[in-house]
Design a protein with these regions (language model features):
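Generic recognition of well-ordered alpha-helical segments
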Residues: 18, 43-46, 74, 98, ...
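Flexible coil/turn residues that form the inter-helical turn or adjacent wing/linker of helix-turn-helix
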Residues: 5, 54, 103-104, 115
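Residue-level recognition of oxygen-bearing side chains
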Residues: 105-106, 121
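Short, Lys/Arg-enriched, Trp-marked, Pro/Gly-tolerant hinge/linker segments that flank
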Residues: 2-13, 17-50, 54, 58-65, ...
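Basic/polar phosphate-binding segments, predominantly the helix-turn-helix DNA-binding elements
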Residues: 49, 54-91, 111-140
Length: 140
């Protein structure tokens, strides 16, 4: 069980690094200088990494940044190119895909681990993102 937990933690860290490299790739070869925006973005990304498995709300992220929900939603989309919920779900789906590859946990268990409490919703988003169900993804 200890080995499985270590593997799980490494999978999460690896998926996060891949996700951050994609984000950096979308914004050029490097992140902008340390500005208020980059500090806020770092705060939100750390919040997502720490809380992705919980029912993380836009209100929580806006509060972490010290701004209103409406301002946060506009700002986050400007910074990342996508809305907060879409970004959070992409992060969760990346982690789920990694867990499907490296563990034999059930799809239901993986969905719950990455923050989806509705299996049908998870399956629908996963299929939209990867073009196949989680079970099909695992068997490929």
């Amino acid at each position: 069980n200890k080995v499985k937990n270590t593997g799980y933690e490494l999978a999460i860290k690896g998926a996060l690094l891949r996700f951050l490299s994609i984000l950096i790739g979308q914004h050029g070869t490097s992140l902008p200088a340390d500005t208020t925006d980059t500090r806020r973005l770092k705060t939100v990304l750390q919040l997502i990494e720490a809380e992705y498995a919980t029912p993380l709300r836009i209100e929580d992220a806006a509060e972490a940044c010290g701004c209103s929900q409406s301002h946060f939603m506009r700002w986050f989309k400007k910074m990342t190119g996508q809305g907060f919920t879409a970004y959070l779900n992409d992060h969760r789906l990346n982690l789920a895909a990694e867990l499907l590859r490296i563990t034999d946990a059930t799809v239901l268990d993986i969905a719950g681990r990455v923050g989806f409490d509705n299996l049908s919703y998870f399956n629908r988003l996963f299929k939209r993102r990867y073009g196949m169900t989680p079970r099909e993804y695992r068997s490929k």
